[in-house]
Amino acid sequence: MESIGIVAPHKMHFTEPLQLQNGSSLAGYDLMVETYGTLNAARSNAVLVCHALNASHHVAGVYADNPKDIGWWDNMVGPGKPLDTDKFFVIGVNNLGSCFGSTGPMSIDPATGNPYGAAFPVVTVEDWVNAQARVADQFGITRFAAVMGGSLGGMQALAWSMMYPERVGHCIVVASTPKLSAQNIAFNEVARSAILSDPDFHGGNYYAHNVKPKRGLRVARMIGHITYLSDDDMAEKFGRSLRRAEGAVDAYNFNFDVEFEVESYLRYQGDKFADYFDANTYLLITRALDYFDPAKAFDGDLTAAVAHTTAKYLIASFSTDWRFAPARSRELVKALLDHKRTVTYAEIDAPHGHDAFLLDDARYHNLMRAYYERIANEVNA
């Protein structure tokens, strides 16, 4: 199926201070935005797609100057795709604190004339949602037909339905969770520790030293990447295969160089990530993941936390996702059904672990296509 083709991002500047959950505020900030499709006259066909940890506003299509830079959810969004841009106006927003053009640690702090670095304020999922709401205001969108996201993006979609219930028709939460488990927080802490202990980190102000803490960022990515894959998927892809040149003896080298194919793969992923991502951003986003817990204000009662929601929900999980296991999605489903919300739940049998939400799986995409067709019918009614 064809891509949406060449797209171009644009930068929105906001001068009104954004109050943050930590008590501080951003006096002025930029958000990178990308749109696909056409907003109808009633402004009723808009869908917001929220991104996960290392993604951005570039949801679909390609850039004219870099045709290899394909949008991170290009198989989901586009003409004739499950989220059909012939029917919907789709918005992607790069979150505050990211490193892809929105205001973040790499941006210049107007108070000092230097990059924010470690001084950039800690942000939360709720802060992102409030910033995204201002983007919607700029487009004159008072209500989204749907807000959708996978993983961390799913947390944002859920937060939208709780913080702005009157502005969300459908909330689509994929491979996500209403809060991180202790195990997930632990993985994030180990990843952050790898970055913080890198000699090139310099307390987060490594820009002034013209270096990057690549060693720490590389290890952080390797840790994270393991959690995105299932055991079965890793066994099928790599097994215990040794990394050897064609025709070489299939025997151990008895040293600490790369021996196994899975080691080579993880190092490749770590190296690639360290080349394009920012370490301070990684710290910020993983901490935002840790802090997300809308039930906390209700003494841990998720049912109470979702009491004032009004959206219809599609919640999808994957059988082999152990990062955000199906049990976490079922917990959310139960809380919503306790209030008799309209909920569609699908637990998809897929071997690819957490990353399954990014892949072109027929059952998964058929589910999304059918659900968006239902939304399109509502929009056109």
Swiss-Prot record:
Residues 45-360 form the AB hydrolase-1 domain. Keywords: Acyltransferase, Amino-acid biosynthesis, Cytoplasm, Methionine biosynthesis, Transferase. Pathway: Amino-acid biosynthesis; L-methionine biosynthesis via de novo pathway; O-succinyl-L-homoserine from L-homoserine: step 1/1. Homodimer. GO terms for molecular function: homoserine O-acetyltransferase activity; homoserine O-succinyltransferase activity. The record marks R323 as: Important for acyl-CoA specificity. The active site is at S151 (nucleophile), D321, H354. Its main location: cytoplasm. Its EC number is 2.3.1.46. Belongs to the AB hydrolase superfamily. MetX family. This is Homoserine O-succinyltransferase. It comes from Paraburkholderia phytofirmans (strain DSM 17436 / LMG 22146 / PsJN) (Burkholderia phytofirmans). It is found in: Cytoplasm. GO terms for cellular component: cytoplasm. GO terms for biological process: homoserine metabolic process; methionine biosynthetic process. Transfers a succinyl group from succinyl-CoA to L-homoserine, forming succinyl-L-homoserine. Substrate binds at R221, D355. Gene3D superfamilies: 1.10.1740.110, alpha/beta hydrolase. PANTHER family: HOMOSERINE O-ACETYLTRANSFERASE. Pfam families: Abhydrolase_1. It comes from the Bacteria. InterPro entries: AB_hydrolase_1, AB_hydrolase_fold, HAT_MetX-like. It catalyses: L-homoserine + succinyl-CoA = O-succinyl-L-homoserine + CoA.
